[in-house]
Regions:
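Short glycine-rich, low-complexity segments
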Residues: 1-66, 70-141, 145-183
Length: 183
């Protein structure tokens, strides 16, 4: 390839390269803006689950939960609080998410599960299992007696029964299988 020696031709080529570079940067910027415009909470939670990022979540009742999102679905997430404890948190109950590390996520990720909240909950708990749940600001602990798409029934430590509408449950705290309690 021969070097361009004509100053006018060199200036024309340099201008064309500069113009192409500017168009490329503008296109990338437009793509980033478009991806940001498409961001959703579910997409962000999916991105955070994929990164295994440590987060602090605040619920609509003002409760803060810390941990790693291990699974993100359309209607709920699994927040791993420790090796033995996890919380199922309804997506609609999440008010804010703060990542402890500085991550630049677009919030356009795809959820790992598209099941309903009742199906999501039932896939993580068993009859007889001791769980804790939050229904609005009410915290209740007990053993699971029954669970269907509408109601979760707990046998509470005081000998009573607690009936919760599954779609009203904001959070379910569970023990992780493989922990000492389940061995």
């Amino acid at each position: 390839m021969e070097a361009v020696t004509d100053p006018a031709l060199r200036q024309l080529l340099d201008s064309a390269r500069s113009s192409e570079s500017s168009r490329s940067r503008a296109g990338f910027g437009a793509l980033q803006r478009h991806r940001t415009e498409d961001a959703t909470l579910v997409g962000l939670l999916a991105d955070l689950a994929e990164c295994r990022a440590f987060v602090a979540l605040t619920t609509i009742t003002g409760t803060e939960r810390r941990g790693t999102i291990s699974r993100a679905g359309l209607f709920g997430i699994v927040l791993q609080k420790s090796q033995t404890d996890a919380s199922l948190i309804r997506t609609a109950a999440i008010a804010s998410v703060r990542s402890v590390s500085h991550l630049r996520l677009d919030g356009d990720g795809f959820p790992q599960a598209s099941t309903s909240w009742p199906t999501f909950v039932s896939s993580h708990i068993e009859l007889g299992e001791e769980i804790s749940l939050m229904v609005s600001t009410q915290h209740v602990t007990g053993n699971v007696v029954s669970l269907n798409r509408s109601l979760l029934i707990l046998d509470t430590p005081d000998g009573g029964l607690f009936y919760a509408v599954v779609d009203a449950i904001d959070e379910v705290s569970i023990r992780v299988p493989g922990s000492i309690r389940h061995d």
